[in-house]
Regions:
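Hydrophobic alpha-helical segments within soluble ligand-binding/sensing domains
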Residues: 173-200, 242-248, 296-318
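Amphipathic helical "hinge" segments at domain boundaries
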Residues: 47-125, 134, 219
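Periplasmic-binding protein-like
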Residues: 73, 132-141, 199-203, 233-236, ...
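Flexible loop/turn connectors
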Residues: 6, 19, 249-353
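N-terminal helix-turn-helix DNA-binding module of bacterial transcription factors
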Residues: 1-61, 353
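Flexible loop/hinge segments that line or gate small-molecule binding clefts
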Residues: 139-182, 279-295
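An alpha-beta-alpha
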Residues: 186-225, 319-341
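Short beta-strand elements in bilobed, periplasmic/extracellular small-molecule ligand-binding domains
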Residues: 101-115, 198-201, 212-242
Length: 353
């Protein structure tokens, strides 16, 4: 018996094959009523897509020569355009997202926190629809780690993903670095270099947004040393901008031999320390950090993976909130640097701060 083809289904539905193809992928460029009618007809007639054909077509659509396929929206919830340009993490995430989107034939429309369109958020779903947006990426979660309530009307209909930080709610797809393993491996690297008293310096708000993954891994990575947990915890200092005096007081009391941090400001502060200078490593290392060692979180790959999540679900016609959200995590790589040698590092006035 001859299998039902897309051409047969198109003839029965009274539309073209391209319309059927888009409707079966639940593409928002086709009216919802038409999509539902064609999907119901396909089910009634027993139509099944040929998986090999779908694979080949997917490869063709994702080739480097792909023409314009649609648009993605990148929404900076707490991120202004200027902050996105200044912050090395956001810059890398955006670069990875935009480069991958371009390679797949997608345009990226940006909506920043200081954009009037974003501030008038009740109108944003209509704007996205008018622009033919097919997928949405969110960047910069609020401190409580949840998406704002006004995004519900967007994520209930669009393919959506969060960049960089997994939201506590709602359950939508996320692309991020594996922050727990990043911190854990960084401590192990310091141990391998003979450091016995590493300390952790970071913003408590950031660690809370990451549900404690940096600090939890810092503690867990040292339990095998036999040192009591409460003594290890004393070597965590919650960073406060400009609080150099409290930092130096804590540093003198705890006497760490190495510091893991997300704050470059620590280096010039340490020049006023009256004890031995520690080795330094950054938990979110970037090539712009002259002389620093640390963990390269591969944020460009995180950004690219977010595009792959969006495009793969679009290809399967999966829109709205997923039944089971995917979290794609990228591992970090250790990068050596002069900051592991305090005498050399602090004698060089060109180090990043």
């Amino acid at each position: 018996m001859k299998s039902l083809s897309m051409a047969d289904l198109a003839q029965a539905a009274g539309v073209g094959k391209a319309t059927v193809s888009l409707a079966l992928r639940n593409d928002p460029r086709i009216r919802e009523s038409t999509r539902r009618r064609i999907q119901a007809l396909a089910k009634k007639m027993g139509y099944r897509a040929n998986p090999m054909v779908a694979l080949v077509m997917g490869q063709l659509r994702s080739s480097s020569n792909t023409k314009y396929r649609g648009s993605f929206a990148l929404i900076g919830l707490q991120i202004t355009k200027s902050l996105a340009e200044q912050n090395h993490t956001f810059r890398s995430l955006l670069r990875g997202f935009e480069n991958r989107a371009t390679a797949l034939g997608y345009q990226v429309d940006h909506f920043w926190a200081d954009d009037p369109l974003l501030q008038a958020n009740p109108k944003l779903p209509d704007v996205l629809q008018a622009r033919g947006i097919q997928g949405v990426a969110f960047l910069g979660l609020p401190s409580k780690g949840t998406l704002p309530s006004w995004t519900e009307s967007i994520i209930s209909h669009q393919v959506s993903v969060v960049l960089g930080t997994r939201p506590s709610s709602p359950a939508i797809h996320c692309s991020s670095n594996d922050q727990y393993t990043t911190s854990f491996d960084a401590v192990r690297q310091l141990h391998a270099l003979g450091k016995k008293r590493p300390a952790l310096i970071l913003s408590q708000a950031i660690d809370s947004l990451l549900t404690g993954r940096f600090s939890a891994a810092f503690l867990q990575s040292q339990t095998s040393t036999g040192e009591p947990l409460h003594k290890i915890a004393e070597r965590i200092w919650w960073f406060q901008p400009g609080d150099q005096s409290s930092f130096l007081e804590w540093f003198a009391q705890t006497k760490p031999d190495s510091l893991l941090t997300t704050h470059l400001e620590i280096a010039p502060w340490l020049k006023n320390a009256k004890t031995s200078l520690p080795a330094l490593a950054h938990l979110d290392w970037d090539p712009s950090m002259t002389g620093w060692a640390g963990m390269n979180q591969n944020n460009e790959t995180v950004g690219a993976n977010a595009v792959d999540l969006l495009s793969s679900h679009l290809m399967r016609g999966e829109h709205g909130l997923p039944l089971s959200a995917k979290v794609l995590q990228v591992e970090s790589q250790w990068v050596d640097g002069a900051s592991l040698n305090p005498k050399l590092f602090f004698s060089n006035k060109s180090f990043s701060a």
